Amino acid sequence: HLFFAGDTGYSRDLADIRARYAARQTAAAGGGFDIALLPIGAYAPRWFMAGQHVDVEEAVKIHRDLGAKRSLGVHWGTFQLSDEALDEPPKTLAAVRLAEGIGEDEVFVLAIGETRRVRARGFVG
């Protein structure tokens, strides 16, 4: 099961999505979201962007609110849309993961051209 956030500001409503979705997805059916595609870029300045674009810390909150098994950071590094540097979001994500004890395989980004093989339930490698 895949969750795609699109452009979004942070809201605790995402925890409600988890509750409603998980109620229909039993453990026997694989339960919850296997992967969430979460935006991690185009967030600065916060006073202007907070309503439309989460920052990295909020993306990690969404990952946890959804109970996603893994999350891929998207919506960064393509073109200069906001005030943060193009390469800032993955660097910030690495720092947030370290601070919160989150593994690199749980919340991650892919480099341009990088691929990962995906099975029906989880990653191959």
State where each predicted segment sits:
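Cap/insert and terminal regions of metallo-dependent hydrolase folds
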Residues: 9-110
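Small/flexible residues
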Residues: 26, 118-119
